[in-house]
Structures are given as C-alpha cells and as structure tokens.
Amino acid sequence: MKNNIITPQYNCNGTFLRKNRSFVCRKGRITKSQLQAIEKYWLSIGIDFKLEPLDFTSVFKNSAPVILEIGFGSGESLVKTAANFPNKNFLGIEVYKSGIGSCLRLAHYSGINNLKIIYHDAIEVIDQMILDHTLSKVQIFFPDPWNKKRHHKRRMIQDFFLIKILKKLNNDGILHIVTDSKEYNFFILNLIQNIDNYINLSKKRMCFEHFKYRLVTNFEKKAKLSGNKIFDLIFKLKK
C-alpha cells in the first residue's frame, strides 16, 4: 500500500504548492491489529492510487451499480451496508490509516466481495480515477464542518466539489450528505441551490431528519447523545 495520500505539486520554480484540504495530515494512532489487517488484506481489497481511471467492471468482476463513500471512518457502516446490498458494488475512500486497517479487518471477516477501498485524497481520486457518469450514488457521512469561519475554506463540500461529483453520477444518480451541524447543513443547501443539475429529493422539508435506508454510524450515536440534530441531505441528478 502506498503511503502518500496526496500527490505533491510544485510550481515552475520547484516550490511546493500548498492547498486547502478538508483533512489534516497526521500519523495518529494505529493499532497492531489494524497494521496486520493492512499487511494481510490490502492486496485483495485495497486499490492503490494511480493517475488513470478505474474500470469498475474489471475491478468488481461485474457490472453492478457502484456506490462511492468518501471518508468512511472505521468502515463499520460501510462494510455492513455492503453486506446488506450484495447486488451493488461499494468503493470507499479514506485518508486515515487507522480507518483503512479497521475497514479491511471488518471486510475480511464479513466475507464480502463487493467492496474496494482507496487510501488517498478524495478529490484527487475523483479527478484521476473515476470516469464520468459511472457512479450510481455518492455518500458523504459527517464530513468535518470546520466550524470556525476562517476554516470554512477547508470544508470538503464546496461548489467546485459538488460540480465534480455531478459529472461522475450517472442518470438518476444520488448524492447523499449527512451532517449534525445546522450551519453546515444550510451552507450546503445554499451551494446546491446555485447548481442547476441537482434536484432536492426532500422537497419542501429541505432535508430529511433521518433517511431510513442508512445505517446509524458510531459518530451519529455520539452526536445524538450530545443532543445534536441529524440532517440527511439527498439530491438527485437531473436528467
């Protein structure tokens, strides 16, 4: 498994170009079992980042719909969802190695064969590895809201990002975002309103308080215990 989660870029003078990213590069804690899972299962479940598009039919050995999840954390929800929907393929992207190790371990012991994961920056993966009109759904559950105003530029959900996702969805494709931040919820809704090709499936309610087909994540359980309201934002690609 390659350890670089971003592709270094330099200007003509050789100076490293720093970009605003939605995550902080840090080593963090990783357990022995997570490291062992990476060593044992990465070759069968993981996909190394490459500057070339994926052929999903070749990757999954079938032509079933592909669902992309960005930032899957420990992978518990992603693995359970993949197990519950064996007729769909799942691709997960995560930038923290501990989450990669945890997800690999869970996926192996679940015995599923419809899940692949990538350890890299999601925007680079979307730009370089995902062909247009190949995803049936993109789900982003509890992205970092970067609550301080001066940090809003770090938020993953920006207008340019939503347009990137739009191009990757196939006809009737779905974008599903979940947040426990009321301010981030309205921030996203305001962005979506200025992009013509998204239909808000929640219609007059503007957002779902809960989406019955989504599994509850550990993060969501903690958010509810803290008294936070959960917002499910679901948008469909306009034909």
From Swiss-Prot:
InterPro entries: SAM-dependent_MTases_sf, tRNA_(Gua-N-7)_MeTrfase_Trmb, tRNA_methyltr_TrmB_bact. It holds the Pfam family Methyltransf_4. S-adenosyl-L-methionine binds at E69, E94, D121, D144. It catalyses: guanosine(46) in tRNA + S-adenosyl-L-methionine = N(7)-methylguanosine(46) in tRNA + S-adenosyl-L-homocysteine. It comes from the Bacteria. Keywords: Methyltransferase, S-adenosyl-L-methionine, Transferase, tRNA processing. One of its GO terms (cellular component) is tRNA methyltransferase complex. Pathway: tRNA modification; N(7)-methylguanine-tRNA biosynthesis. The active site is at D144. One of its GO terms (molecular function) is tRNA (guanine(46)-N7)-methyltransferase activity. Its EC number is 2.1.1.33. Substrate binds at K148, D180, T217, N218, F219, E220. Belongs to the class I-like SAM-binding methyltransferase superfamily. TrmB family. Catalyzes the formation of N(7)-methylguanine at position 46 (m7G46) in tRNA. Monomer. HAMAP family: tRNA_methyltr_TrmB (MF_01057). This is tRNA (guanine-N(7)-)-methyltransferase.
